[in-house]
């Protein structure tokens, strides 16, 4: 060992890193998360749960819109049908009233024509009788003064009979005209009452029909909402059950089952709402 000499030392260190693959299958309330890792790389998957729920939400939204759209269309159709029923009732009542008034007008016109013709015939008979009496009187005076008294008596009698016949005919025509006017007044009153009753019944029928349709639509909407709530609860239960699955393939199968079930329930709700509104 010299003056400036020193000691020598040597050391060796070894380190070994082992990488292991670890798959962890989870159970319980884990929200559908499955974690697996390889060394420092860790991945987590829900096996399509979120995407499935998004698709299901879209299906449920479309089904709800279709159901409420059908209910809205049925409400509009029922209101339009009730309004048309009321309009048709008034149109029918107006037609009946018009026909009745036209018939009464025709009867009155025929009665007036009959009275006019009767008075015309009576006037002609009286004119002819008086002319015949005048002619007979002149003939008797000119031909045989002895028969003048008898001719005058005969003429007077014939004139009286003609006047009586004309008076009876005139009275009969007036009685017939009065009776026709009375019948026309009764017919007009009857048709007016019938038209009023028909219009009232048409309005009552329209109101009842509208109320019935509104009740059906309200019941349909209520049932549709209840079915949608049940479908939502079922979807959430499926999602919860799926999140508790023990393997990747079982989770995928649960997703498909959930989507098919929700689509079927939504279609059933729409058909039920439509059939309820139609009935």
Swiss-Prot record:
Region annotated Disordered, chain positions: 1-28
Comp. bias (Low complexity): 9-23
Membrane spanning stretches: 256-273
Keyword Lipoprotein in record: no
Main subcellular localisation: host cell
Membrane topology listed for this record: Single-pass membrane protein
Keyword vocabulary terms for this entry: Host membrane, Membrane, Transmembrane, Transmembrane helix
One cellular-component annotation, GO: membrane
Localization annotation: Host membrane
Protein name according to UniProt: Uncharacterized protein Gp-j
Source organism: Pseudoalteromonas phage PM2 (Bacteriophage PM2)
Taxonomic classification: Viruses, Varidnaviria, Bamfordvirae, Preplasmiviricota, Tectiliviricetes
């Amino acid at each position: 060992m010299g003056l400036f000499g020193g000691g020598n030392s040597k050391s060796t260190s070894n380190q070994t890193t082992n990488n292991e693959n670890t798959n962890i299958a989870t159970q319980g309330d884990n929200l559908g998360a499955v974690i697996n890792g390889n060394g420092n790389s860790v991945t987590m998957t829900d096996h399509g749960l979120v995407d499935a729920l998004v698709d299901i939400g879209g299906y449920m939204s479309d089904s709800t819109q279709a159901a409420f759209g059908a209910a809205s269309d049925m409400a509009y159709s029922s209101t339009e049908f009730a309004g048309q029923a009321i309009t048709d009732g008034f149109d029918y009542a107006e037609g009946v009233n018009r026909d009745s008034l036209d018939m009464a007008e025709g009867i009155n016109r025929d009665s007036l024509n009959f009275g006019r013709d009767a008075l015309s015939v009576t006037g002609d008979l009286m004119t002819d009788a008086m002319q015949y009496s005048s002619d007979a009187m002149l003939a008797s005076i000119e031909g045989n003064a002895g028969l003048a008294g008898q001719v005058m008596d005969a003429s007077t009698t014939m004139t009286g009979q003609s006047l009586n016949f004309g008076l009876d005919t005139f009275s009969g025509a007036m009685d017939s005209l009065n009776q026709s006017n009375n019948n026309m007044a009764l017919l007009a009153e009857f048709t007016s009452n019938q038209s009023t009753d028909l219009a009232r019944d048409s309005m009552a029928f329209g109101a009842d029909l509208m109320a019935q349709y509104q009740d059906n639509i309200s019941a349909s909407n209520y049932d549709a909402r209840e079915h949608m709530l049940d479908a939502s609860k079922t979807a959430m239960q499926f999602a919860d059950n799926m999140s508790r699955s023990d393997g990747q393939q079982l989770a995928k199968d649960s997703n498909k089952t959930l989507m098919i079930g929700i689509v079927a329930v939504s279609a059933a709700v729409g058909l039920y709402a439509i059939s309820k509104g139609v009935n």
